[in-house]
Each structure stands twice: as structure tokens, then as C-alpha cells.
Swiss-Prot record:
Organism classification: Bacteria, Pseudomonadati, Aquificota, Aquificia, Aquificales
Interaction with substrate tRNA, as annotated region: 31-34
Name of the featured protein: tRNA dimethylallyltransferase
Gene name in the database record: miaA
Summary of the function given for this chain in its UniProt record: Catalyzes the transfer of a dimethylallyl group onto the adenine at position 37 in tRNAs that read codons beginning with uridine, leading to the formation of N6-(dimethylallyl)adenosine (i(6)A).
Listed cofactors: Mg(2+)
Organism: Sulfurihydrogenibium sp. (strain YO3AOP1)
Any GO MF annotation of the entry: tRNA dimethylallyltransferase activity
Binding residue positions for ATP: 6-13
Length: 307
């Protein structure tokens, strides 16, 4: 199994599809927003044409109105791995959602499952209020995450209110060292300014492809703005434009800034992952990275076969 991780707009999708073609593999997505049907442009979901005939798993699995947890992801991930291996192919995992990657590769802690009623109440509060609560009940975990990382803040508070124990207690107890699968892991990195420029270009292309129309269609289908899915970057910023509260240009600027902030949080999250090798994507062409990963994978296979 090969895992390609990294921040948004680092070039993971293009690399993994070419790698799958080279190694006769199939792709498992590790993106928390690509699981939703009808949400394609704003999530940068690869189109059927962009997939170039490569089978993709854990994409379009639930409606935007349905709940989907890390536990659900792990179950779908395991099924995908089994299907791919039964075909005699290589699973290639790609994405930027570390909670999914961590859960699939190392398992879950003993923290309780999500309580969606409690979670909805927490999501109704503003970030600063939530973060202030977290600092009081779990300063250790609060110091590890950003004040705007609402998903992680809500999860940590949810665990605390359900158990009376800080989320950091469960993380420290699990340790996340034992692997559920053997894998060869890589994290794509890019020069900071280059990454910011790539994000701006990506957002512009999203608007050209019809992002506004996609969000309007979701609203017309009855998916409310309070849903977790509709609070994704690229969607929540369009909603006030549709309500005529902000201009289209302001909505676009918000998406760009929020995506940049999100990428910075991802970069921090992916630091110090000792089971993963960093690849400076800014310094290499795609074919050079392919050749490097291909050689590393073949060496890994040879090493395993001689043990």
C-alpha cells in the first residue's frame, strides 16, 4: 500500500492517478468532503475524465444530509483495500484529511463515537467561544490545534462532554504507533508562496467550472446551510452570496483566504509524521516523483520478500 498525503493544492491527485497507472493500482480517497454526493467542484473531486479509467473508492458514498464519521470511513477503507487486493492490484491512498488517514492506518482511540445532537449544538457556536471552552477543559490539545480548526475543536469538546475526560487523554492512551497495514507513506510539500498561488488559481477554476451553480443546486435540493457538508470551504462562502448579503467577488476572496488558512493548518498537522517521507514537489517534475516512488516501492517489496 502506498499513501500520498499533503495539504490541499499540492498536486496529490495528478500524482496518484499517474502512479496507479504505473503500478496497476486503484485509488482510495482520504478526503472528508469527497465522501458527499453532488459536491464535486468545491471539493476538487477528480472528474471521471480526470480519473483516466482508474477506479476510485470512498468517493460519493453519502448524501450531504447524512452523517459520516471516521469509524464509517475506516469501514469503507477496509472494504476498498480488500476489493483492490482481490483484483491483485495495489491500493494507493490519497488525501489531506489526517483524521481519516490516521484512523485507517493506526486505528481509533477509545474515545466515544460521535453524538450528532451534541455536535450540532457545538457547531452552532462561533470558533472563538468553542476554542475558549477547549482551553479550559483540555489545554494540552488546545495548544496543538488552531483556533479556526472547528472540526477538531468540536470533536475534542464532544469527547469531553460525553466522558468528562479530555480528548488528549484518549490520544495519549492510544499512542497511534501500531499499524493496521504495512504502507509506504509520502507527504507532498511545496514552497509556501507557490502553494498560495496554486490555491488562487484553483479557486478561479472552480468558479469557471460552475461552483456557484453547484451550491445553488444543493440549496434547491433542500440541503440546509447548517449541515456539516454545507459548512465546507467553497460552499459556506457562496451561501451568503446567494442570499444577496455579499458580492460574488467577496465570496471568492473569502474562499481563497479560508483555503489558504486551511492549507496552513494541514501543513502543521503533517509535520513530524515519522512514518512518512517528505517530497518537495516544488523541486521536481511529476515524472521525477513517479520514478522516485516507483523505485522506493520496488525496494520495499524486495526488502519484505527477503525478510
Amino acid at each position: 500500500m502506498i499513501v500520498i498525503a499533503g495539504a490541499t493544492a499540492t498536486g496529490k491527485t495528478e500524482l496518484c492517478i499517474k502512479l496507479a497507472k504505473l503500478l496497476d493500482g486503484e485509488v482510495i480517497s482520504a478526503d472528508s468532503m469527497m465522501v458527499y454526493k453532488y459536491m464535486d467542484i468545491g471539493t476538487a473531486k477528480p472528474s471521471v475524465e480526470e480519473r483516466e479509467g482508474i477506479e476510485h473508492y470512498v468517493i460519493d458514498v453519502v448524501l450531504p444530509s447524512q452523517n459520516y464519521s471516521v469509524k464509517d470511513y475506516i469501514e469503507d477503507f477496509d472494504k476498498a483495500v480488500q476489493k483492490i487486493r482481490e483484483k491483485g492490484k495495489i491500493p494507493i491512498v490519497v488525501g489531506g484529511t489526517w483524521l481519516y488517514i490516521q484512523g485507517a492506518l493506526y486505528g481509533l482511540s477509545d474515545a466515544p463515537e460521535s453524538d450528532w445532537t451534541l455536535r450540532e449544538k457545538l457547531y452552532s457556536l462561533v470558533n472563538l467561544e468553542l476554542y475558549t471552552q477547549l482551553q479550559k477543559v483540555d489545554p494540552e490539545y488546545a495548544n496543538k490545534i488552531h483556533v479556526n480548526d472547528k472540526r477538531r475543536i468540536v470533536r475534542a469538546l464532544e469527547v469531553y462532554y460525553l466522558t468528562g475526560k479530555p480528548f488528549s487523554f484518549f490520544i495519549n492512551q492510544h499512542n497511534f504507533k501500531s499499524k493496521r497495514y504495512n504502507f509506504l507513506g509520502f507527504i507532498l510539500e511545496r514552497d509556501r508562496q507557490e502553494l498560495m498561488d496554486r490555491i488562487e488559481i484553483r479557486v478561479e477554476k472552480m468558479f469557471e467550472k460552475g461552483l456557484v451553480e453547484e451550491v445553488k443546486k444543493l440549496v434547491d435540493m433542500g440541503f440546509k446551510d447548517s449541515l456539516t457538508s454545507m459548512q465546507a470551504i467553497g460552499y459556506k462562502e457562496i451561501l451568503p452570496y446567494l442570499d444577496k448579503k455579499i458580492s460574488l467577488e467577496d465570496a471568492k476572496k473569502c474562499i481563497i483566504e479560508n483555503t489558504k488558512d486551511f492549507a496552513k493548518r494541514q501543513i502543521r498537522t503533517f509535520r513530524n509524521k515519522t512514518d512518512f517521507e517528505k517530497i518537495e514537489a516544488s523541486k521536481f517534475e511529476v515524472n521525477e516523483m513517479l520514478d522516485y516512488i516507483y523505485r522506493k516501492y520496488n525496494q520495499e517489496v524486495r526488502d519484505v520478500s527477503t525478510r
